[in-house]
Amino acid sequence: MHGLLLAAGLISLPLHVLAHPQPSSTSLAGRAVDLNEYRIGHRSSYTSNDEMMKQPSIASFRAGTYVEVATEMVKQTMPNMEFRLVDDHYIGQSGIGHVRFRQTMHGIDIDNSDFNVNAYDNFYQIGQDGKVLSHGNSFYTGPAPESSPVQKRDFSDPMQALHGVRKALNLPIKAEGATVENMSEHKVMFKGTSGALSDPTAKLCYMAKEDGSLALTWRVETDIGDNWLLSYMDAKDTGKVHNVVDYVAHATFQVYKWGLADPTEGNREILTNPWNLQTSPLTWLADGQNNFTATRGNNAIAQYNPDGGNDYENNYRPSPKNLKFEYPYSANMDPPKTYIDASVTQLFYTSNVCHDLYYMLGFNEKAGNFQVNNRGQGGKGNDYVILNAQDGSGTNNANFATPPDGQPGRMRAYIWTRANPPRDASFEAGTIIHEYTHGLSNRLCGGPANSRCLNAIESGGMGEGWGDFYATAVRLKPKDTRKTNYVKGGWVNNSPKGVRMYPYSTDMSVNPLVYTSNNQLNEVHAIGTVWATMLYELLWNLIDKHGKNDGPVPIFKNGIPSDGKYLAMKIVMDGMAIQPCNPNFVQARDAILDADKNLTKASNKCEIWKAFAKRGLGVGAKFDPKNRIGSNEVPKECK
């Protein structure tokens, strides 16, 4: 999703709205279409480890690989269901095997019906073979079509679906004279169109609807820059849109060092070889085939993009022959293009440090991270992050597009016009970390091959909340305590109030948000603020118990971060991979508890419960999209 801004028009909480009202970031830019109308609904269930222990028949299976165990579990749990194994399974850094299955009907995918199993493998977890930690499920259980629509040819031509999505969403794509080419069974590509950054495609698939029925659709994929859309068009009535998913969420280096949120927190420094060879063994300036003297390498490619276009490879980027990426910058310089070298360098630096830190915490090749060359470590390569500094396609925002593993991510950092002179988003680390974290959460939740699992309203909200949480955790200072409050986007927006409803604070009088606040919120950034507030409580509960490592990287003991800050970042990340597709807050909370149970044998159970319960997500909390029920209760052993 788009990354930073808070939408206007929030329903009446007793809120002191601290952000300037902004247009909703879930709209199609300039085309008056609200994508919130087409969000996928919450259908997933999540069975936590505590619930699994009550069902011993499905908690443990005959010893085998984690994939075999997971497959057997799905067969037993969903007998007579047709499904396929998704080719993105892996064993995570914490020893959990993550396996995902897609439900099919007559050989056609049900695109929003998934089953994910978190299981152990005896090779990695001695004595745990055959055991399942938890699972998530959104399989369709309603009536099935009697026969295959492919045999009956009971669907429209895919070109009609492309025309339908153009008209329904008012897309700037022209398809007159375009041709259709077969890519694979049930999937085609449209050649000869204009207005999209790549050739649109269409795939025949089913969608499980919230009313319990099944719709045959054409999934039309269109990348138009500010939006990278998967539009599910009815395969019979191609003017009808069922759902829409948007992938976009909005040497020596002289930079603001990692940990400084923006130029007000410190001065620029010259850093020599700032990469971590454990996580970037090719350095930031090589990809195993080529050595570069510009801001490109295995993890990212950064450039100036004033026209907002797609031809990034031929765009300008700093390329000092002596590898000294040292350029002048002051927040008082104007116009912004006069310091573009410094801007691109800063964006390249911050994004690469994100890559390295997240790698240490578990976002590696197998988990679907962003690299050209995966060096035989699993996953799909050829997907560095395209970093566009001073992108001309917008202002006062930033965004990140996350297609599935094997396709490059794309970040756009804009100029902000709230100050005079304008401010460049590349210099606010919190904005860049927030955007990069969209790539992290979209690749982990649902698995590397599925970037459609943060589309439901609470799921999308958590996508925004994770971005704020990681950006805030990184900026903590040595003297900070749980009484320290932080705003989001204060510098770039030229406002001490930032761009969120409230500061992040453990003080209920400063930030009163609780789980039931979501009943009055219908915009992902607002809902994300509630989620990040809960995670901020969790962060400080773990810091109070384990202390705070103020260094730039975690210190591990037996695979566990030794301090509370990095431990919180680790279990939140592990929870992303454990939870089901399109989770709600309750399911994501349970996934974090299961992540801690796996990593530390639940030694932080009460700290986690108390953090969530303080903000209304306690034992009795229940999800209902229209009437969430809050709870401040913790388990009896935590009272």
From Swiss-Prot:
E.C. number: 3.4.24.-
Record-annotated active site: 435
Glycosylation sites: 291, 598
Pfam families cross-referenced by the UniProt entry: FTP (PF07504), Peptidase_M36 (PF02128)
Record's subcellular location: Secreted
Chain residues in the propeptide: 20-250
Residues at which Zn(2+) binds: 434, 438
Cofactor: Zn(2+)
Group of enzyme by EC: hydrolase
Keyword Zinc belongs to the record: yes
Homology family: Belongs to the peptidase M36 family.
Name of the protein: Extracellular metalloproteinase 1
Organism annotation: Arthroderma otae (strain ATCC MYA-4605 / CBS 113480)
Phylogenetic classification of the source organism: Eukaryota, Fungi, Dikarya, Ascomycota, Pezizomycotina
